[in-house]
Each structure stands twice: as C-alpha cells, then as structure tokens.
Amino acid sequence: MDPSSAGSGGNSLPSVGPDGQKRRVCYFYDPDVGNYYYGQGHPMKPHRIRMTHSLLARYGLLNQMQVYRPNPARERELCRFHAEEYINFLRSVTPETQQDQIRLLKRFNVGEECPVLDGLYSFCQTYAGASVGGAVKFNHGHDIAINWSGGLHHAKKCEASGFCYVNDIVLAILELLKHHERVLYVDIDIHHGDGVEEAFYTTDRVMTVSFHKFGDYFPGTGDIRDIGHSKGKYYSLNVPLDDGIDDESYQSLFKPIMGKVMEVFRPGAVVLQCGADSLSGDRLGCFNLSIKGHAECVRYMRSFNVPLLLLGGGGYTIRNVARCWCYETGVALGQEPEDKMPVNEYYEYFGPDYTLHVAPSNMENKNTRQQLDDIRSKLSKLRHAPSVHFQERVPDTEIPEQDEDQDDPDERHDPDSDMEVDDHKAVEESSRRSILGIKIKREFGENATRVQDGGRVASEHRGLEPMAEDIGSSKQAPQADASAMAIDEPSNVKNEPESSTKLQGQAAAYHKP
C-alpha cells in the first residue's frame, strides 16, 4: 500500500472493509515497551513490538487509526483478577532483591522461564493497561481495538507462567462484561490459552475457544474433552492440533467452528489473541501457517461486525512476528499492505527478500483429513446462548475528553480506568510445566480430576464459584442440544456479516476458572 493512499483525514478516519462496513480502529502503543528485556538467550523479546510499530508507521497505517499511549494499569485494576499478595510481590521484587525472596519466587513461579526483569511491574502495568484501555474504547464508539503488547494468556490468578506475569486478557474481558452480556475469547496462539480458560471455566458469560498444538507440548492442557464445568459446561471449546498444520487445514476447522459459535453464542464483543508462534518457522512453534493464513482468522472474525479486541501473544521469530501483526493491522483497517517492504528502522532484519510475506515450509502436515473430521464431529455439541440478568453493574470507566488536535498521536493517552472490584480468594498452586522444555509429558495426577462429562477441572477449582465474581449469573439455561452446533464442512460455511447492530440477542456467557 502506498503510504500516500492512507488518507489525509487525521488518525480518526473510519476504515471501510471488503464487506462495506466502516470500522473505527484504535491502537495502543507505549514506546518504552521495547526496552524491557527478559535476559540473554530468552526467546521472549518485547523488542518485537517496537519493530511492529515501525512497520505500521512506514506503511502509513498509523494515520488511519486513533493511536493512544496507554495509562498504566493500577494495583486495584490488576487485583480484579490477580491475588493482592501476588501483585504486591511483582511490585516489590527486583533483580537486586530477588535472592532475598527465594520462597516467594518459587511460590509465584517466577524465575528462569518468567525472570525478574528490570522494571517488571511497570512492564505488567503497561501491557495490561493497554488491553483494558482497548476494552474501554468499545464503550465509546470504536469497533476494533489493537494492543500487540498484550495477549499474555498463561498468567494465573497468583502465579506467572509461560513468559506471562499478568493476564491482561482476563482483565480486558472483565471490563467488557460491564456492558456486554456475553464475551467470546478466541486464541490462535500455538499454545493452549490455559490462563484465560481457567479464569472463566465455571461461568456461562464468557466462552473460550482455543486452537493449539496438543500432546507433549506446553502447557499440556486443552484436551478436546475439557468443555467447562458447572454453569460453564459447554462454554470452553478446545481444538487440539498436530504438527505441520497448513492454511487450508486450519481454516477447514476455524471458519466452520467459529461461524457456528458466533451463530449460537451471539457475543456482544470478541477478544482475539493473535499469537504469532503458530506461524511457519517460529523458533518455538511447529505449525506451518503463512501470514495470510494466520490473518484470515482476523479477517473472518472482523466480518461479523462485532466489537473486536486484537491482542498479541506468543511469537519468537521476531521478524515474522512484526510482519504478521503489521499485516493483521492492515486487515483490521480493511487495507492490503503491499508485499514489498518500505525502508524502515529495522529493514536489515527482513533480508534478504525484504518482503512482508514469507513462504511456508514443506514440512509434513500430520493433521489427516480423518483427524480434522473427528474434531468437527466431537465439537458439534453446544447449547444455545442462555439468557442472563445483570447484577448491579460496576461503575463505567470514565474517559476524559481527548485532544483531537494533539500533534503527535503517539503521545495520546487512553483514559484512566477506575474499575471497582471484588477481591477473590487465591487458588492453590497449580501443576507447573515449562514452556522452554517443549516436549513435556501430560499427566493427570492428584491435582486434577475428570468429571463425568470428560472435562478436566483442577482440584483447586472444584466447588468454587467463577473466579470473576462480579460478572453476574445466568438464569437457568436450556438443556444441552446435541444438534445445536452441527459444524458444517468448510465448503458450506457462509458468513453473512451482521449490520452495525452487532449481532442481536445478547445473554449469558461461559468459561474456565
């Protein structure tokens, strides 16, 4: 795309997609986020966010969005989900003092995989504040919000996991539930979105759908039989995949499954975690998706014209991460960035071809047609969206007036968030696996049990109410209907984009603790 074609209407220009529907897109970025450093040899590199931003600037995409520098999430906001003692630890620990806190490091799973980095608490505040800020924007006229620094889906209520310290996704969903009866979470990272699923496993107001590598692979969760518990039964969907899945095979599952989920669940908002470690050639991944194949998930979810929060996640071949999230920003805007890459600050990273797209490899696709058919068959059971009544709503987050004439859009700030929250009981330590050791046996020991429906519920969650206690409760839902989610073959899938009425019929939602 020629940067000159981006338009001269400032950074509040609504974009028009292929479906003819206008989208108001906002984008959250803190220029300091690229300075955080996990340590020498660590695969997680926040520098990839700065690389992505540089590409967005050179492609002229920033001019088509409202760009905000996020306000850091405050302690009480973080404690809407996380245990206060855990947040206090993240705030106080430093590389210099960590040796004096060995017991707490072990308790909260902070160490080699999730190291104590300089400015750890500020880092968490930054990416969490951006995700919550994006959720707030949906209440003020925006259709799509983007935070590529977010999407850290492994963090638990009181422990770090898989390079993730604070679960910005859960915090954003809790914000969305103030105004939306049902919220859908979709995860296309190669790793199972265990932290988000766990947070909403027993409620029917949030539904989680995760497409991930399953087997001897971190975090070892996400069995197709894990479907939610109690009120949340059938509100967790897991799509376990094998090595080498390509664009065609992936979309043969993604579109029919998500088309049926949107039809049956009817969410008021969608959160899409766009982990780029599912791309071909990722340092820690084993899938074979092209950037266009990965972005097709964004394009498809965008077409429903439901408020859409796009978040980052995994991705460890950082030049491809930047390529992917730049292209997906273009998709969100209804644009098609040209393949030839403009000269930019990190141009040398993208040699020798200097293109936005890279060809997938010729690796074997171990996902057979029979396996894909079996997955569709097993997932073809989903109850209809339940009706829901709100408890007293949490006060709206107030947004001060923005200065539309401010010269530098990167200096804009999103509004202060003033989320009043209930404290939640901390859960016990969960079984820990390492994301750095990819081949990990999956076992069911004393800390897990299988309930009658085949769903797996960690022992610390048995008998607990949903961890997000302030999200309301549903009225008695209808019995599960075996025919409610008969997933069609991909050739039969047709998505009729909804109008700006944003999918009518909102009710309860579901998810894991």
Swiss-Prot record:
Localization recorded for this chain is: Nucleus
- Biased region (Acidic residues) positions are 398-409
Coarsely, its chief localization is nucleus
The catalysed reaction is: N(6)-acetyl-L-lysyl-[histone] + H2O = L-lysyl-[histone] + acetate
Query: Which residues lie within the region annotated Disordered?
Result: 384-432, 446-513
Q: Which GO terms describe its biological process?
A: epigenetic regulation of gene expression
Map out region (Histone deacetylase) in residue numbers. Answer: 23-334
Keywords recorded for this protein, A-Z: Chromatin regulator, Hydrolase, Metal-binding, Nucleus, Repressor, Transcription, Transcription regulation, Zinc
Keyword Transcription among record annotations = yes
| Annotated protein name in UniProt | Probable histone deacetylase 19
